Amino acid sequence: MVTFLAGGTGTPKLLAGADDVFSPAATTVVANTGDDIELGGHLVCPDLDTVLFLDGEVLDRETWWGIADDTAETHTELTRLADAAGLDGGPRYLPDDAQTAGRDIARWRRFSGVAEFMHIGDRDRAVHVTRTSLLDEGRSLTAVTRTLADAFGLERTLLPMSDDPVASIIHTPSGPMHFQEWWVGRNGEPPVEDVEFRGAERASATDAVLTALDDTVVIGPSNPVTSLGPMLAIDDIQRALHETTVVAVSPFIEDTVFSGPAADLMAGVGLEPSTAGVAEAYPFADSFVLDEEDSTPLDVPVVRTDTTLNDAADAERVNRAVETALSEVA
């Protein structure tokens, strides 16, 4: 049994070539929910959905977001209607009192659907509507995710990191903003001064997540701050990782990041934006998989390979390196 911690696109790209190395039936994926937002009244869970769509064989592999060949009639009409009415596209937060009203899972990250600032496809939207409706019927996010996973025919077990609200808030010179506003709405601007995982001090992992963390854990080459940071900010997840075997794949080659905002976010929270900084962020890691061009010295065993993840063959190669690293420390 093995458990992958997933956020962003790094770990999903690794999972795309994992089946011949780690049996899907014996694999659990715990996904970040700090990036989730409520948009136009519907809960959008980007990191859960990337794995849901990947394993459901409908993921758009060009963007690693949304459903391949999806239409966007509703999104287009929302934009047209806002333009016709002279409404600013935002991102538009709901009023402060609305941020902590209603369903708890969406606290501190509620946005208006006026000219929605995230591109939501029509089939993708159906998932968000179904998820939110099931939550409003009284089900937990874990239970709803299980229902959606069954609908998409997943063999791997997919779990949210918690059923409690945790929101990734980026602190900037322009004030605090949710990660999705900073990354999607503002293209990674302004500069990062700090990152807060609001609600993490009161959140707990579910029994299902803690059971999964009893198994060997793999952290893919995802962003250590906003993809993994919300999980690590939950005390019982942090404790569990210190008590199990963990192998991590660096998203850097020395100080060059493969993609995404990891470097800016790491610098913003006082971590060196490099493989060395990733190792500092993961003090519980028993071994690392690094790129063959990465000579960073670490205090734990290292397996090196080409860590490029452009296709399934690349992903299988990196998974084989993870398997080797696990064999050395298990």
UniProtKB/Swiss-Prot annotation:
Matching Pfam families? CofD
Q: Which UniProt keywords apply?
A: Magnesium, Transferase
Q: What Gene3D superfamilies does the database record attribute to this sequence?
A: CofD-like domains (3.40.50.10680)
Catalysis: reaction(s): (2S)-lactyl-2-diphospho-5'-guanosine + 7,8-didemethyl-8-hydroxy-5-deazariboflavin = oxidized coenzyme F420-0 + GMP + H(+)
Q: Which residues bind 7,8-didemethyl-8-hydroxy-5-deazariboflavin?
A: 49
Q: Quote the EC number.
A: 2.7.8.28
Q: Which cofactor does it need?
A: Mg(2+)
Q: Pathway, per Swiss-Prot/TrEMBL?
A: Cofactor biosynthesis; coenzyme F420 biosynthesis
Q: What class of enzyme is it?
A: transferase
- Biological process, per Gene Ontology: F420-0 metabolic process
Q: Which GO terms describe its molecular function?
A: LPPG:FO 2-phospho-L-lactate transferase activity; magnesium ion binding
Q: How does it assemble?
A: Homodimer.
Q: Which NCBIfam families match?
A: F420_cofD
Function field: Catalyzes the transfer of the 2-phospholactate moiety from (2S)-lactyl-2-diphospho-5'-guanosine to 7,8-didemethyl-8-hydroxy-5-deazariboflavin (FO) with the formation of oxidized coenzyme F420-0 and GMP.
Protein family per UniProt: Belongs to the CofD family.
Name recorded for this polypeptide: 2-phospho-L-lactate transferase
Give the source species: Haloarcula marismortui (strain ATCC 43049 / DSM 3752 / JCM 8966 / VKM B-1809)
**Gene that encodes it:** cofD
